[in-house]
Structure formats: C-alpha cells, structure tokens
C-alpha cells in the first residue's frame, strides 16, 4: 500500500475506535458512578457495563492490530505477540456477542408478557440469574479462545510475513487454510448466541403484537409504558442483530485475506468495517436507556456551556 493509503486508513480506524471507546466508556462510567452512589447495581446496569468494557477491549485490540499491520508488520513473525493479539481478539469478540445476547434475553424476560410457567419462573428470578449467566459467558469465551492460538505454528507465521513472497507454496496454503478454518469454526459458534437473540427479538415482536391488540380492544391507546418498553427493547435487539451481521461480513473479509495477494489491505478494510459494530451500537444503547440518555444530555449541556463561556 502507498503511504497516503496507509495514513488515510489509519486515520479512519483511529477515529472509529475513539468514538466507540468514548461511547462505551461513558456507559461504564455512568453505571459505575451509580453503583458507588447507591451501593448497589441493577441487573441491566451490570449487563450494560460488562458489555461496554468488553467492547472497549475489543476496539483496542482491533486498533492495535491495525497499527501493527501498517507500521510494524514484522511483529507477526514473532509467535508470542501474535498469540497474545489473537487470543484477546477472540476472547473479547466472544464476550461482546455473549453479553449482547444476555441483554437481549434480559429485555425479553423483563418486558415480554407470556403466561407459560417456565417463562414466569425465569421472569421472577432473572435479576438473580444475571451475574451467574455473565460468569458462564466469561468461562465459555475463555474456552473458545484457547484453541485459536494452537494453530499459530512457526510455518504459519512465516507464511503471513508480509515482506516475503512465499505465499504461493503448497505448504503455506495448507497452513493458512488450517488457521482460517479454525477461526471460522470458532466464530460459527457465535451463531448460537445470535440465534438466541433472534428468537428473543421475534418473541418480543409477538408480545408487542399481542399487547397492541389488547390495547385496541380496551381502547386505551398505544402510548402506555409497556408499549414504549417493547419498542425500545425491540430497537436495541434488532440493531444488535443487523450490526452483528455486518461484523460477520467484515470478519469473512479479514479471514479470506490469507488467500489474497493484497492481504494487508483486505485485513485493514475488514477491521474498519468491524469497528462499526461495537462503536455504533453503544450510542444506540445510550439513546434507548433513560438513565444513560439523561446523563448524556447533561454532559452535552455542560460542554455547550463551557464552549459558550470560552467564546465570551
């Protein structure tokens, strides 16, 4: 790549990452301050904080990988650094998806209205189950992250060296194919939490439809709190599903780069697209949460006041 292309792509990557990190840091900070003030944290705040912190780590790893790829490509020839980056990328990637799924499940059980005994049993205990569920997600993510480092053999590291023209050999192709297949298989595991979120979304839609029909029969209107809660939860879940699909497409671009002549450019483009998912979803969550939205309005008002004071 040319120097101008490198500079432009790095600038875009840094801007995307910083915006996302600020959004997720805001979520974590507001919930942490609320925890310190009230000496307790609600289940929804715990999920949002865990999700925000996992995405901050994910964005830092993606940005670090972009910087290394452009500025220090020879780093990928050293096994230790590559293993660390790959491990934490896989870990934070899985954590982000699993925590977002926990958020979808929480919205479903808290807001939806069904009368099945199992649903009601979980609905009444969902607040107590959240911490255990998040810990289980952490353990699962750790288990899924370990296998990816086992395929980073010396042969593979020599094959991904960007300065050498040995990518056409059969041995390199086999090594890269094996590594890529492991990454693809590990990410296929994320289809399960994605499916759970999709089912939660569909059931929320069903619950909203039943609720609106009931409102029509009672002639009470559509602006009741339950309808508003349904709509907000549905928006949060559908935004996650759409952005996650975009993220998966970006991952496929980055993974397929092992078989492309301009692999460095393909990886960076994949990572630029991947950064959209954790960055934009954080602001959707802020706008959909009344406490976070009010806090963001207060911050913006203070910033506006400070800027006016400096002007005069």
Curated annotation (Swiss-Prot):
Question: Organism's domain of life?
Answer: Eukaryota
The residue spans the entry assigns to the Cytoplasmic side of the membrane are as follows: 31-49, 123-128, 209-235, 288-312
Where would you find this protein in the cell? Answer: Membrane
For this UniProt record, give its keywords in alphabetical order, as a comma-separated list.
Answer: G-protein coupled receptor, Glycoprotein, Membrane, Receptor, Sensory transduction, Taste, Transducer, Transmembrane, Transmembrane helix
Instruction: Share an example GO biological-process annotation for this protein.
Output: detection of chemical stimulus involved in sensory perception of bitter taste
- Name the predominant localization: membrane
GO terms for MF: bitter taste receptor activity; G protein-coupled receptor activity; taste receptor activity
| Signal peptide (residue range) | none
- List where this protein forms a coiled coil: none
**InterPro entries under this entry?**
GPCR_Rhodpsn_7TM, TAS2R
For whether the record's keyword set contains Glycoprotein, the answer is yes
Cross-referenced Pfam families:
TAS2R
Tissue specificity note: Expressed in subsets of taste receptor cells of the tongue and palate epithelium and exclusively in gustducin-positive cells. Expressed in 15% taste bud cells in circumvallate and foliate papillae but only in 2% in fungiform papillae. Expressed in the duodenum, antrum and fundus (part of the stomach) and in gastric endocrine cells.
Which regions of this chain are Extracellular-facing, per the record's topological domains? 1-9, 71-101, 150-187, 257-266
Q: Where are the transmembrane segments?
A: 10-30, 50-70, 102-122, 129-149, 188-208, 236-256, 267-287
Per the record, membrane topology reads: Multi-pass membrane protein
Q: Which residues are glycosylated?
A: 151, 167
Its cellular-component GO annotations read: membrane
Query: What is the documented function of this protein?
Result: Gustducin-coupled receptor implicated in the perception of bitter compounds in the oral cavity and the gastrointestinal tract. Signals through PLCB2 and the calcium-regulated cation channel TRPM5.
Q: Which family does it belong to?
A: Belongs to the G-protein coupled receptor T2R family.
Q: Quote additional remarks.
A: Several bitter taste receptors are expressed in a single taste receptor cell.
What name does the UniProt record give this protein?
Answer: Taste receptor type 2 member 7
The gene designation is Tas2r7
